[in-house]
Amino acid sequence: MIDENAPALFVADEQGRYHPTRYAIGPWDPRLLHGGATGGLVAHVLEMADPAPALQFTRLSIDLLRPVPLAPLTAEVKVVRTGTRLCVLSAELRHNDKTVVLAQALKLKPEAVTVPEHARPDWPLPADPETLSVTDLMGRALPPPDARRPSMHHA
């Protein structure tokens, strides 16, 4: 039995279907999923099927082909190309045999990069990220994390 109120965006069943929970509902229509939740599921299935764990994900392109319903989804991942320096994966999310999402991921071999002197900035590096203030999209300061209201998907 699927717990639709689990503290997760999706719950997988024994048949490999992903059942969205109430946390995955989008803001426009209660029958449809949020794009962020859908993107998270795509990233999850790509990571789980990863044939090249030594490579790093460097790009993820997601196409929402139609509205994604608040209903069980199936996922399929295919290896498009793999080698020692790169790997290309494709993912497809389906509902009732209709493709609702197509995605492609690129993984590359991590390598040390030396930045030449002429390409380095003349100004100092920014402060430690932990000391920087956090602002909203309009540039207004946000309260510290422990004083913030939880988002609607994490309430």
What is the meaning of each model-derived region?
Residues 1-155:
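Terminal targeting signals and extreme-terminal segments of soluble enzymes
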